[in-house]
Regions:
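Acyl-donor-binding surface of acyltransferase catalytic domains
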Residues: 1-4, 66-67, 74-158
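Structural signal for short hydrophobic segments within the conserved structured cores
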Residues: 11, 57-59, 161, 207-209
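Helix N-cap/beta->alpha junction signal
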Residues: 14, 119-120, 164, 208
């Protein structure tokens, strides 16, 4: 692994770094996607997953004491998140992060590693230039301003309600079975799923609904 540029240093992350890491991820997303979707709570809940070891599975790059880049590896080494603040890009920090994350993924026993990047973005080009290839394509759906979704009644015998009690575990099972059909997708533990869905900071009960028959 190449050394970081002069003036930069690497260290482990702690929960107290959440706000700084969010600021880096947000700045990177704005530069790559042109709009901000990530929320502080997204990172908070990811770090709260029982399977995630923040001290071992994540890294920060600092400059003058401030975090300017960060990366983390999760889901048994198969999924990475990483960002370099736009003000510090083009100095080899991204390459250093990629090497660190790849090494950590191998140590977790992963045979592949993936990260989401907007098509045609700087991050997308960086990953391709680093030897990565497109695995899946996903779309962000948007409802145009002023548009309305027409009411569509459920078929007879079905009912919609807010998930409570045993509904939560049943909803987890449905999600795992549905998305488990994706090639290469590993089953997520119930505890990890809860951390990012039901127990995510700010989540309201109405945000998880189920259809019953």
């Amino acid at each position: 692994m190449d050394a970081l540029p002069s003036g930069y240093a690497a260290r482990s992350l702690t929960p107290a770094d959440l706000d700084q890491v969010y600021a880096v991820y947000a700045a990177d997303e704005l530069a790559n996607a042109g709009e901000l979707s990530i929320e502080r709570e997204d990172i908070d809940s990811d770090w709260s997953r029982p399977s995630f070891d923040l001290a071992a599975d994540a890294i920060a790059v600092t400059h003058a004491g401030a975090i300017v880049a960060a990366g983390e590896i999760a889901r048994h080494g198969n999924r990475a998140e990483a960002a370099v603040h736009p003000d510090h890009q083009g100095r080899g920090i991204g390459q250093w992060l990629e090497s660190w994350l790849a090494d950590r993924a191998v140590r977790q026993g992963a045979s592949s590693i993936a990260q989401i990047a907007p098509q045609g973005s700087t991050k997308d080009r960086f990953l391709i230039d680093s030897g990565y290839a497109l695995a899946h394509t996903s779309w962000v759906l948007q409802l145009p301003e002023g548009a309305a979704i027409p009411d569509r009644p459920l078929p007879p015998g079905y009912a919609l309600r807010t998930a409570t009690g045993d509904d939560i575990a049943a909803a987890y099972e449905v999600v795992q079975r549905a998305f488990g059909e994706w090639e290469g997708r590993a089953r997520e533990s119930y505890e990890d799923w809860r951390a990012t869905i039901v127990d995510r900071p700010g989540t309201q009960p109405w945000q998880l609904r189920v259809i019953t028959q």
